[in-house]
Amino acid sequence: MKLKTLILSAVAAAAFAAPALAQSPAAWEMPKKGDWIITGRVTDVFSEADNAITTAAGADSGLKVDVGDSVMPTLGFTYFLTDHLAVEAILGTTKHEIRAQGGATDVAVHETWVLPPVVTLQYRPLTEGRFSPYVGAGVNYMLFYSGEDKNGFKVDLDDNFGYALQAGADIGIQGPWNLNVDVKKVWVSIDADVNDGALKSDVDLDPWVVSVGVGRKF
């Protein structure tokens, strides 16, 4: 996880928001029923997948899957159903390199863009103060597009649904502005076929989605 990158991005986002904050002298107030928070984030999506790559007959090839990290900007849209319950959807896309590794082999086989929308229902226990922690649960859909095969391999990835858990917090700054820290864990598995099924893998992507950013309440 590129933690240093995320921290530096959060500092940059806060600096970018500073002029707007200077024009918002009012104290930050907890969001209430009917409010929106739109959050711009820097997000690191990383998977620890290391599933085996097998032959069409199911024999172990000696290779495993490796999926690269990706840090990209994302947007979060949160609507408050009540003072304590909110629905969040995230919008963003990330690019990942897929490698086959094992023994002396370490080769890139595919690079793909992923659209991984996540929708969660959040519970927020606090209604006063500047610190608004939350937990949530929801669903995810992994959509792969604009894939590029590498080094003579042909890779097909199946889209699939998954589910997610979430924890995070909004920290009030002033006026409608807040800092946001958010962590999601997504559980999703996909089928990957290599060279028209000559090789295959059931890949447990199960990515972590770690974000920092600045939000505005409407």
Regions found by a protein language model. Name each.
Residues 51, 96, 100, 174-218:
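Predominantly the C-terminal beta-signal and adjacent terminal strand-loop region
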Residues 44-46, 74-149, 207-218:
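Gram-negative (and chloroplast) outer-membrane scaffold detector with strong preference
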Residues 18, 34, 83, 127-133, ...:
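Short coil turns and loop connectors of transmembrane beta-barrels in diderm outer membranes
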Residues 94, 112-119, 124-126, 158-164, ...:
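Contiguous, function-dense segments enriched for cysteine-driven chemistry
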Residues 21-77, 146, 217:
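Short glycine/proline- and aromatic-enriched beta-strand/turn motifs that initiate or cap beta-hairpins
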Residues 1-34:
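Cleavable N-terminal export/targeting peptides
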Residues 50-57, 99-106, 145-154, 191-198:
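Outer-membrane beta-barrel translocator domains and adjoining extracellular loop/strand segments
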